[in-house]
């Protein structure tokens, strides 16, 4: 895409972090923006912040775990603005109690929650928006937020979900090319970013609550403490948003806002696979 002024962007997980930064960047480029998030009060604050940039803003409370919420979001976006040109499937959760825990001990409630938001939320976003975007016949772009965790070696629902988003996005890009569509796609794989993703437990639905959270959290404490410190030292969300905007503008698929050592680890893993070395 080369023209952004007056076009429409939809961003999920838009009340904070990377999502809010992307929404602000799109507004700076003259776009109308649809903000979606599960948290009502932060969403209202984000709406005011983005409105101050100029352009029209629509805020929709939506839970990316719920297929019906995602289709309702698409309905609201198309009914309000007539079309959507950029869709950012960005909302995600970390499932902090599952970090540092052997994969066979992670309860299904964690898998259902993390995979439901991080992977199925992206898939439902594609299903809800892409057919309508294709039918409009205009230039557009899908941006799916994965993680460097989606390019590395690890276990647990977060890493598995992000690997899924990478592969889904690669397939989406190839599908668009094969049909000669005016749509394209990018996958964003950030390293450590200064966000509040580790606090996502507050949004876990009651039916997927953990009864053993205190016990598991203690086992994962050191892992989470290290992760929290890394997040604090991470790059600002605005830098991720800058790279995302440039990727949409330049039709670049892989967006890697991460330090060189993280990118090098991806190459090392790929070389290990080709050499048939065991994971490390």
Language-model regions, residue ranges each:
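A short, exposed helix-loop element centered on a Lys and neighboring polar residues
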Residues: 126-127, 170
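Residue(s) in the substrate-gating loop at a strand-loop-helix junction
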Residues: 147
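Canonical Rossmann dinucleotide-binding motif of NAD(H)/NADP(H)-dependent dehydrogenases/reductases
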Residues: 2-34
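Active-site helix of classical SDR
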Residues: 126, 161-164
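The beta1-alpha1 cofactor-binding region of Rossmann-like NAD(H)/NADP(H)-dependent oxidoreductases
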Residues: 40-41, 61-72, 108
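SDR active-site lid
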Residues: 177-255
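Substrate-binding pocket helix/loop in short-chain dehydrogenase/reductase
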Residues: 98-103, 107-112
